A protein has these predicted regions:
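Residue-level signature of the C-terminal ends
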Residues: 24, 63-66, 103-106
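Short, solvent-exposed secondary-structure capping/transition elements
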Residues: 62-75
Length: 139
């Protein structure tokens, strides 16, 4: 995992997914949620899918009035272009919250969990994801 910090956009997978969202809009969100559903059925979410889920949660929280101010510059343009289409996805908040919970569940289910646990930075990463989940829940 190419990561330089524990933040939602502090790794290559997250930035790649954000670029996909910028290009594809809501279709990228639908795609990552479908990939999460497939992964959960198989019992394991790989780090690329998990990173996409984290970024989708950031985008959704921001679009519903609970942004992470530190990310405004990075997500603002893509969100401005695709916000309406993103919010039109059925059950988006419920599905994204469920996916985020799976990413943060355990090392048996989530590669991101496993990688962060091995890195020695798990507590900081998990705290950041829990804070994101709280913002998403409040949104």
């Amino acid at each position: 995992m190419g990561a330089w910090g524990v933040g939602s956009l502090d790794n290559d997978g997250s930035l790649d997914w954000l670029a996909d969202f910028g290009d594809m809009g809501a279709a990228a969100a639908v795609e990552v949620l479908a990939a999460t559903d497939e992964s959960l059925a198989d019992g394991y979410i790989d780090s690329d899918v998990g990173s996409g889920v984290v970024v989708l949660a950031e985008l959704l929280a921001a679009s519903r009035g609970k942004p992470n101010p530190a990310l405004n510059d990075q997500i603002g343009e893509a969100l401005a272009r695709h916000k309406a289409d993103l919010l039109a996805i059925d059950d988006l908040k419920l599905r994204t919250t469920k996916a985020l919970d799976a990413v943060l569940s355990d090392a048996e289910t989530s590669e991101l969990y496993d990688l962060w646990e091995e890195s020695g930075e798990f507590d900081a990463w998990a705290a950041q994801v829990r804070e994101l989940r709280a913002r998403l829940e409040a949104a």
